[in-house]
């Protein structure tokens, strides 16, 4: 299934061009505690960040995240809320103009993964990705991102992803994809088409000079209820 999205913006993916490196999956960096409305959180007694208004709101729906104007201060749902056991196992991006595969990564089957002690497992492992690109990625016009994912024994109705990209907390682009219905215990594949805008030279240079200040939130909904939230940041300098 191929999904076409309207508009353009800063896209995701990693470029396998000379001088570029693939994505490094790293633990989520410590994030500044801020409210999702864009204002800084007020001091609160006790350790830990103060939850923003969306973290206190349950359930969270698509309209809630479509109103965000800056990167969230933390994850808006826990891994346990993925009751449908949605698991992304393959990701590939290609330049739509040339057809060149820019990057491809595949998760090994469960039978080939090393055993992990549950006590040592980071609950946020796999929810944050750090990408490293060459500057040339910012000049691509259109990229296709193929995702392959499995679901558990529950039917998945109205599966939807909203992905919002920011540079220095300025919204660059919001993407909205509808996966539709997924039958239980199925493996699914679809390609999302990212149309990139023509960025100004000034903005391109700023994004290159300030690695990892380009960030994104990816929100996944089933029946208009948030069940997964992933984060990423991006460097376009071509170096770690």
Swiss-Prot record:
Pfam name, any one: GMP_PDE_delta
Protein modification: Phosphorylation suppresses its interaction with KLHL18 and down-regulates its KLHL18-mediated degradation. Phosphorylated more under light conditions than dark conditions. Dephosphorylated by calcineurin.
GO terms classed as biological process: endocytosis; lipoprotein transport; mitotic cytokinesis; negative regulation of caveolin-mediated endocytosis; negative regulation of clathrin-dependent endocytosis; nervous system development; visual perception
Gene3D superfamilies: GMP phosphodiesterase, delta subunit
Phosphoserine PTM sites in chain numbering: 37, 39, 41
Highest taxon above the source species: Eukaryota
Record PANTHER family: PROTEIN UNC-119 HOMOLOG A, RETINAL PROTEIN 4
Subunit structure: Interacts with CABP4; in the absence of calcium. May interact with GTP-bound ARL1. Interacts with ARL2 and ARL3 (GTP-bound forms); this promotes the release of myristoylated cargo proteins. Found in a complex with ARL3, RP2 and UNC119; RP2 induces hydrolysis of GTP ARL3 in the complex, leading to the release of UNC119. Interacts with NPHP3 (when myristoylated). Interacts with CYS1 (when myristoylated). Interacts with MACIR; interaction only takes place when UNC119 is not liganded with myristoylated proteins. Interacts with LCK; this interaction plays a crucial role in activation of LCK.
Name the record gives this protein: Protein unc-119 homolog A
Encoding gene per record: UNC119
């Amino acid at each position: 299934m191929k999904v076409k999205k309207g508009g353009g913006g800063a896209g995701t993916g990693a470029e396998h061009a000379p001088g570029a490196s693939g994505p490094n999956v790293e633990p989520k960096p410590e994030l500044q505690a801020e409210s999702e409305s864009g204002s800084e959180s007020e001091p609160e007694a006790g350790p830990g960040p103060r939850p923003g208004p969306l973290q206190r709101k349950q359930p969270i729906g698509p309209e809630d995240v479509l109103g965000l104007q800056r990167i969230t201060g933390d994850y808006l749902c826990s891994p346990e809320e993925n009751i449908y056991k949605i698991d992304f196992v393959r990701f590939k991006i290609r330049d739509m103009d040339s057809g060149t595969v820019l990057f491809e990564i595949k998760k090994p089957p469960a039978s080939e993964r090393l055993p992990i002690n549950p006590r040592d497992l980071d609950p946020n492992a796999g929810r944050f990705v750090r990408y490293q690109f060459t500057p040339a990625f910012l000049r691509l016009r259109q990229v296709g991102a193929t995702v392959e994912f499995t679901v558990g024994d529950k039917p998945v109705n109205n599966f939807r992803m909203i992905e919002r990209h920011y540079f220095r907390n300025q919204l660059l682009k919001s993407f909205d994809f509808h996966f539709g219905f997924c039958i239980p215990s199925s493996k699914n594949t679809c390609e999302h088409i990212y149309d990139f805008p023509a960025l100004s030279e000034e903005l391109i240079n700023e994004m290159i000079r300030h690695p990892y200040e380009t960030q994104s939130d990816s929100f996944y909904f089933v029946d208009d209820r948030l069940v997964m939230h992933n984060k990423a940041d991006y460097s376009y300098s071509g170096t770690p």
